[in-house]
Amino acid sequence: MAENVVQLNKSSQQDIDRKIAVIFVTDVVGFSKSMEVNEEETLRSFRACQEILDKLFEEHGGRIFNTAGDSVLAEFQSAVSAVVCANEFQKLIKERNKSVSEESQMSFRIGLNMGDVIIEGDNLYGEGVNVAARLEALSQANGICVSKSIVDFVNKKTELLFNDLGEQKVKNTEVHAYDIAAVSYTHLTLPTSVTV
């Protein structure tokens, strides 16, 4: 009986695919309110922004795992690539907002974390994902909030400045958070070969 239990536990562990990954979470600020005001225009604007994000994911190695409403969850193998992608996205959204009507403008929050995740089909689970979502909730509109694990890998590979927000309590969990200070898109560099 005990042997069967051990075999069952081993089988269950083998079915679970775990790895360290960089998690990218974003959503639209005030999406529900915008939908109440003008559903069609809000959806058109969101799709336009989503096309921008999809192209950036393709360029920087992001893999989309889940989308729900205005939220997007993606995974990167490189912390540097994820930060580059996030910054470029915010830059392009800022430029887009200058060229469209006020009701068509959109603002995004982004959270980035590197941690342990569980992969099951097209879904990601685990503490690594939860922390990224909490960081996204901490982010300012048009901002990017990242974990200490991201900063440790990215800090010496770019010229970005990070504001240390210290330990932030979100949903009964403390997260050491940073936000990107005065995002400098022109100075952001991506090494020719990068790893997490």
Where are the language model's segments positioned?
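Catalytic NTP-binding/metal-coordinating core of nucleotidyl cyclase/transferase enzymes
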Residues: 4-87, 91-92
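Catalytic beta-strand-to-alpha-helix segment of the class III nucleotidyl cyclase homology domain
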Residues: 51, 73-179
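Acidic, proline/serine/threonine- and glycine-rich low-complexity intrinsically disordered segments
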Residues: 182-184
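Conserved small/polar residues in nucleotide/adenosyl-binding loops
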Residues: 186-192
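Acidic, Ala/Val/Gly-enriched low-complexity intrinsically disordered segments
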Residues: 194-196
